[in-house]
Amino acid sequence: MYRYDKNNNCILEVEDIEFSKVGLKERQNLQEWIAKLPNCLGEELLIIQKEFDGFKDTKERLDLLALDKKGNLVIIENKLDDSGRNVTWQALKYASYCSSLNKDEVISIYQQYLDKIENTENAVEKISEFFDNKDISEIQINEGGHSQRIIFVAREFRKEVTSTVIWLANYNLRITCVKVTPYKYGEEIFVDFDKIIPIPEAEDYMIKMASKAQQESQIEETITRSENERTIFWRDFIAYDSENNLYKNKKETSEPWLTL
């Protein structure tokens, strides 16, 4: 990042720093910034819970839970200076836990959050407002097989994380990596949020390619299953008809016909 010096008609480099070096914390700072202004992540989001731990039979807790404009649940995991190695597995667990939440449960979770932050507004009304004042009965929330998304936020991402995220995209798992960089100029601190995965210019292409790959995989599985079923059928049929000797020298096949 550079600062424009009007007097000298030049630009001056602004120092990028580590959060920890200036005493900034993950929960007290980064998490609160996103909770108060989620649009900093590059899209419209509605934060519906913070440090959510309402999962059955586990005490695990995710950082932030949000809704996007398509009604998907968005799991947001913050890692400050270093993403660490295990954040992907951690967030996938949270996404699986959230996959079973229905609309009423999501509304209840959001209402608990509003009550906790002493906001007197109604969760149903806030959700309706977020979805352009649609009636709550018309809003689809967390519906379908791929209605959970994940956003990772960190200053630096390890290769283990970025490689896994890109690979998972081939299986239609939607994970976004947002690089957050703090800068210091004098006594002021500036913060820049930059989506690095998927690259904005290639996001639509990546989604289409992931969908195509998934469709091709499903077709391949269907063909393989059909071939196996036909092979078993002809094997059993030939054995059953062995007393007539019509197919005595024939072998089972994966084709839908048997040549006499």
Protein language model regions, located:
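Charged, terminal alpha-helix-loop-beta segments
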Residues: 1-260
